[in-house]
């Protein structure tokens, strides 16, 4: 199997990223597909890596969806679900505030996720500008998963986002992340989610106002598991079998 990772930049800023795990004979076709993903860019980096010992995860997190009339209501609900997942309310509220203001210490977005101590709210990622990226995950049969989600009523324009985000959230749980908070930095996309082993993958709209280019991810973890979780998130390859 091969891991194929695409990263696109425009004027020095990250604008698009995607990843696939495919058999060797599908590498060329997949690279061409990933090159079509960024809408605008001045630099694209494609990495192809041979993988060993790919773990099969039987099922993804179950999907639930909720719509609210305001960002305030949506975020309050997100906090309640994070509390249900085991995150203390002050820590959940701190994470919301962090993503709202921009998690990069220099202002704006990070390339990866914040790692937050679930008990204290302390930031644990070694590089607070870069963060931690969850990589080397995909679906065993991506085409089949797309068809199933279409039949469930997921709109075509949201499919790729949902499939990619659900794979990330599922791998995070596999690696020991206790809960996750996320919303996109895409100004036009206001749906975010919270996720965890006990709450599933919970889509929530709107987690921010339209036109806001700030977003990111917060992973809630136990501090004593930091090194093990980082290694798993960044290095352990997994394929998800089914929904």
From Swiss-Prot:
A single GO BP term for this record reads: biotin biosynthetic process
EC class, as a word, reads: ligase
This enzyme's EC code(s):
6.2.1.14
Which chemical reaction does it catalyze? heptanedioate + ATP + CoA = 6-carboxyhexanoyl-CoA + AMP + diphosphate
Q: Give the matching Pfam families.
A: BioW
Pathway listed for it is: Metabolic intermediate metabolism; pimeloyl-CoA biosynthesis; pimeloyl-CoA from pimelate: step 1/1
InterPro entries found in the cross-reference section = BioW
One example of the protein's molecular function in GO is:
6-carboxyhexanoate-CoA ligase activity
Requisite cofactors: Mg(2+)
Q: Which UniProt keywords apply?
A: ATP-binding, Biotin biosynthesis, Ligase, Magnesium, Nucleotide-binding
Q: What does this protein do?
A: Catalyzes the transformation of pimelate into pimeloyl-CoA with concomitant hydrolysis of ATP to AMP.
Q: How does it assemble?
A: Homodimer.
What HAMAP family does the entry give?
BioW (MF_00668)
Q: Which family does it belong to?
A: Belongs to the BioW family.
Q: Which NCBIfam families match?
A: bioW, PRK01322.1
Q: What is this protein called?
A: 6-carboxyhexanoate--CoA ligase
Native organism:
Thermocrinis albus (strain DSM 14484 / JCM 11386 / HI 11/12)
Record lineage: Bacteria, Pseudomonadati, Aquificota, Aquificia, Aquificales
Q: Which gene encodes it?
A: bioW
């Amino acid at each position: 199997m091969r891991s194929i990772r695409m990263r696109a930049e425009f004027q020095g800023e990250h604008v698009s990223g995607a990843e696939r795990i495919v058999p060797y004979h599908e590498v060329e076709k997949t690279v061409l597909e990933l090159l079509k993903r960024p809408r605008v860019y001045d630099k694209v980096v494609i990495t192809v890596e041979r993988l060993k010992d790919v773990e099969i995860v039987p099922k993804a997190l179950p999907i639930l969806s909720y719509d609210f009339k305001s960002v305030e209501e949506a975020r309050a609900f997100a906090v309640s679900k994070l509390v249900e997942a085991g995150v203390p309310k002050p820590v959940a509220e701190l994470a919301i505030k962090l993503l709202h203001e921009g998690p990069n210490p220099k202002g704006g977005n990070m390339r990866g996720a914040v790692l937050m101590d679930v008990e204290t709210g302390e930031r644990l990622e070694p590089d607070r500008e870069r963060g931690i990226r969850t990589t080397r995950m995909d679906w065993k049969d991506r085409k089949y998963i797309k068809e199933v989600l279409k039949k469930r009523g997921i709109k075509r324009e949201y499919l790729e986002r949902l499939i990619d985000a659900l794979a990330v959230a599922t791998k995070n749980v596999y690696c020991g992340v206790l809960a996750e908070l996320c919303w996109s930095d895409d100004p036009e996309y206001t749906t975010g989610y919270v996720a965890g082993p006990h709450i599933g993958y919970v889509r929530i709209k709107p987690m921010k106002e339209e036109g806001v280019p700030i977003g990111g991810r917060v992973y809630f973890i136990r501090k004593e598991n930091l090194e093990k979780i980082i290694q798993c998130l960044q290095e352990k390859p997994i394929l998800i079998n089914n929904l």
